């Protein structure tokens, strides 16, 4: 690594490392611009000639392939992206200083300074950390279970849709179970090494000895991206997981993570748009699905606006524009955005699939079951992420139809529900929580005379926090409440069976949510409390109890009854284990607890200020 002759051989036409680094960054910015204007193959073709010599070309090329793999979950895409990212990492290693930033991590005396690194070497460090992190993500994906052999195909085929054949072959693991555990451990090691590198680089940037080189905005942008991503992600984890990670050296600060990403997003670097996309994911997905539904939508719109102006037909930004409209409760506007996103490009079908998923939920919010079914059906035929979930949703929507509506589709919901368990896949040896939930709910259909689920589509809507969407529009909430009330009346009139209490409690949970958003607070509280009162009678849907406590706590928080809310949240966290969607519930409990404690602290400060005055 330290031999000058070897380094110079990496640069054609006698270029210096510094000039070649600047040129590489300019070219990668051009490729990124092509990508953001939906010219996906052109971006890859532009980058490919220098992927064997330039670490930035190699990393950017591999990143685009990884984005494709993340969207398709296809083993071919995962394998291809993994191999390319490994090559990028090896290339970064060739450019790194022999004594890297983490080599002396354990020594407080001999810790490195930036003066010991050339500009190229310090860029190699941040690119190396990025490769490690992205390879870790792919390692976790390599436990995906898909049918069919992995067939070689061209590197430049982003139009590839799901090639997984129908039938039980999808049950076979892409890797064996024990290999999945090895993959998981390897992925964890990569994450830790990446974390330590970013941590050291952040310390170097903050040091007084930091001297900025010609391409320092790109280097700093890379550090801010990594440090911000780690801090933000770690800060969201449930307390019990975070304590374990802190024991092995990890720590996360949400405010610092957001600050780093916001600074990275506001700069003019190669990674600025990556910081923007990560922040948009955080604001429009993570805090919404894994949080309380309180989203900083103004910040999301502020981040998106300049990119939507610059790339008005950019599929990525149109998609986020649709997500923002969903969260605001503007469902018709969201539908137009997602349809526009699909029309904007035809090359990467994976973007279409993301839009189909969102459109499925948009029509669910409107109670238009035929359109919801249509998009679930499209996903089940074209996308490999979770066949079990898609088929379950098809069955769920069919069960919401009137009997006269079934025939045109030629599907039978009972047969579809029965097919769900055979479509399960695994990632890193673990089943997807949504699939496990769908499989558990489908089990009742295996009896000779199955008892139907009362409102399966509206139950899954709760799992994805959809009531926080319809709650923005009283008309939508009224429509869903009417459906739930009819289901409640049918349960009351019907004969008692082994699922009666479970179904009644489910309906009360969903009814309570609608009543809450309609401002009928007392009625909502009564519905939530009735679930806890029937705790001992619930046989199967044990997830209802901690979630009822969570929803009751959120209701109390809106009334500034934060101390009561915290007690309920603590009970939900400590007293219930091994239920469906437990991790997602714990994420939401963590977010609610932090919000309640923050409100209490603000109230205390206000009281102290008023007393001092």
Curated annotation (Swiss-Prot):
TPR repeats lie at residues 315-348, 505-538, 546-579. The keyword Transmembrane helix does not apply. SMART domains: TPR. One of its GO terms (cellular component) is centrosome. Keywords: Repeat, TPR repeat. Pfam families: Iml2-TPR_39 (PF10300). The keyword Repeat applies. PANTHER family: TETRATRICOPEPTIDE REPEAT PROTEIN 39 FAMILY MEMBER, TETRATRICOPEPTIDE REPEAT PROTEIN 39A. Belongs to the TTC39 family. This is Tetratricopeptide repeat protein 39A. It comes from Homo sapiens (Human).
